[in-house]
A protein has these predicted regions:
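Short, conserved charged micro-motifs
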Residues: 10-15, 57-60
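Short, well-ordered alpha-helical segments
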Residues: 13-20, 70
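Short coil/turn motifs at secondary-structure junctions
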Residues: 8-10, 41, 53-55, 95
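Short glycine-/aliphatic-rich beta-strand segments at the starts of folded cytosolic domains
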Residues: 1-8
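A short beta-turn/loop motif at secondary-structure boundaries
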Residues: 37-43, 80, 92-94
Length: 96
């Protein structure tokens, strides 16, 4: 799963600090890989990437969201600028 955020570059350090909370949530809920990337060619473009065991497991993650988790997500979304929400992409392995 990738989530693309557009943020004010002046708030990058603050955004990265907030994303540490989301990393803990993703890991707790089964992500075995989590990274946050910045685009060196597009200032303010940040991409969260995480992997879970399966599509079903990812769907289950949505069912396990707590009130506290939702508050963290909303805090992070507040960094996102632009008219559209953060772009979410779901990729599944072509072969297993």
């Amino acid at each position: 799963v990738t989530v693309e955020y557009r943020i004010d570059p002046a708030r990058t350090a603050e955004f990265v600090a907030a994303m540490r909370h989301l990393r803990q949530i993703r890991r707790r809920d089964g992500a075995f890989m989590w990274e946050l990337f910045h685009d060196v060619e597009a200032q303010g473009r940040m991409v969260e990437s995480f992997m879970v065991e399966s599509w079903i497991e990812h769907l289950r993650q949505h069912e396990r969201v707590t009130v506290a988790d939702r508050a963290v997500s909303e805090m992070i979304r507040a960094f996102h600028i632009g008219g559209e929400p953060p772009k979410v992409t779901h990729l599944v392995a072509a072969e297993r």
